[in-house]
Amino acid sequence: MRLIPLNQAEQVGAWSAQHIVNRINEFNPTADRPFVLGLPTGGTPLNTYKKLIELYKADKVSFKNVVTFNMDEYIGLDTNHPESYRTFMFENFFNHVDIQEENINLLNGNTDNHEEECQRYEDKIKSYGRINLFMGGVGNDGHIAFNEPASSLASRTRIKTLTEDTRIANSRFFDGDIAQVPKYALTIGVGTLLDSAEIMILITGHNKALALQAAVEGSVNHMWTVSALQIHPKSVIVCDEASQQELKVKTVKYFKELEAENIKHV
């Protein structure tokens, strides 16, 4: 596992965006051989999306031959609801770059058969071989996507019941009213994520410090699903100083020395 210890959340956005651009450009995607990118929602990746849009407008990258898969979606929210993850992605990223709409893949939380929808999503991912790079965030309790504590580390795309802690955290997007936050969601599984060629997780803020500690210094544990990154052959965590507060000083020093060349220009 790589750890990229930065100072500010804005630097996390800049580093992660440049990493995505580098991977896309190195891959040199075509219509017949697209780059497959996994994407999250939430507050943490907003800086990354802003920087990606800047890099696109500066002609540093094209998303024309990029296929995307999102991590999750609430069940029961209208497609055009302001807090649906579909709305989030179009408003904060898709509408601002040259991605083709037919290359955008989003879970549908309003189908009559959720299990069928989850299998369709898994099959669609497999039709591309695998996801080349999956970017994600992490919850205060260490969950990735909506794989809440005690989720199977071999899990696939499925329905999940959201914990009260997650719903309280997400209520900030629903005028602070937890009653408006859906109780269920469709989410990729931990196993689905681990099938990706590369995983990049963004962690920012004091409230994520315990999750970062569990991911880096703890054991692989289904109570902290982010810890599954330890068994992935190519994973990277990009974090700000606030989220590093629970890490040992020598851990941060070790990774700063390892990644000195990769972070000096951020």
From Swiss-Prot:
Its EC number is 3.5.99.6. The keyword Metal-binding does not apply. It catalyses: alpha-D-glucosamine 6-phosphate + H2O = beta-D-fructose 6-phosphate + NH4(+). GO terms for cellular component: cytoplasm. GO terms for molecular function: glucosamine-6-phosphate deaminase activity; identical protein binding. The record marks 151, 158, 160-161, 254 as: Part of the allosteric site. The active site is at residues 72, 141, 143, 148. Pathway: Amino-sugar metabolism; N-acetylneuraminate degradation; D-fructose 6-phosphate from N-acetylneuraminate: step 5/5. It is an enzyme of class 3 (hydrolase). Keywords: Allosteric enzyme, Carbohydrate metabolism, Hydrolase. It comes from the Bacteria. One of its GO terms (biological process) is carbohydrate metabolic process. Homohexamer. Belongs to the glucosamine/galactosamine-6-phosphate isomerase family. NagB subfamily. This is Glucosamine-6-phosphate deaminase. It comes from Aliivibrio salmonicida (strain LFI1238). The lineage of its organism: Bacteria, Pseudomonadati, Pseudomonadota, Gammaproteobacteria, Vibrionales.
